[in-house]
Amino acid sequence: MKCPFCNSEETRVIDTRLTDDGHVVRRRRECEHCGGRFTTYERFEQKPIFVVKKGGQRERFDRNKVLNGILKACEKRPVSIEEIENMSSEIEQEVLRSGKAEISSKEIGEMVMEKLKRKDRVAYVRFASVYKEFRDLDHFMDIIRELKDELKKRDRRD
C-alpha cells in the first residue's frame, strides 16, 4: 500500500480491527519512510446497486454520498465522526441486505432521516430542509410541528 503522504511503498500495518459487524477490516498503517500514519478499509466486493433518482436517471450507490449528506446535516452539532460513520454504515448495510439491484433515492433519504431523527433533531431538520425541498416557510413549519408532536407522544410513552 502506497503512503498517501510521500508515495513510498514501504508501509506496515500497526493495528487491524473488524468493523461493521465483521463486514469491514480497518487497518491502521504507518509509513516506514516518512512516519506518516493513515487508515485503510477493506470491504468485500459486491454486485453494484443502482440508485434511481427522482428524474429516473440511475447511478451506482455511493456510501460516500450518504456519509457527506449526514456530515453536512451534523455540522457544528454534538455528533461524533464515529456516530456519523456508524449511521452511514448502517444505511449501507440496510441497502445491501435489501437484496435489490435498484433502490430509490427517496428510500435512502428516508433511511437517513430516520437515523438523524433519533440522533439529533437539529441535524434531522437540516437534512429534511434539503431532502424535502420545502416549497415555502409553511411547509418547513409543518415538518417541525410533526417532529414536535412525535416527540410529545414519545415522551408520554416513556
Swiss-Prot record:
It holds the Pfam family Zn_ribbon_NrdR. Its cofactor is Zn(2+). GO terms for biological process: negative regulation of DNA-templated transcription. The keyword Protein biosynthesis does not apply. Residues 49-139 form the ATP-cone domain. A zinc finger (unnamed) spans 3-34. The keyword Transmembrane does not apply. GO terms for molecular function: ATP binding; DNA binding; zinc ion binding. Keywords: ATP-binding, DNA-binding, Metal-binding, Nucleotide-binding, Repressor, Transcription, Transcription regulation, Zinc, Zinc-finger. Binds 1 zinc ion. Negatively regulates transcription of bacterial ribonucleotide reductase nrd genes and operons by binding to NrdR-boxes. Belongs to the NrdR family. This is Transcriptional repressor NrdR. It comes from Kosmotoga olearia (strain ATCC BAA-1733 / DSM 21960 / TBF 19.5.1).
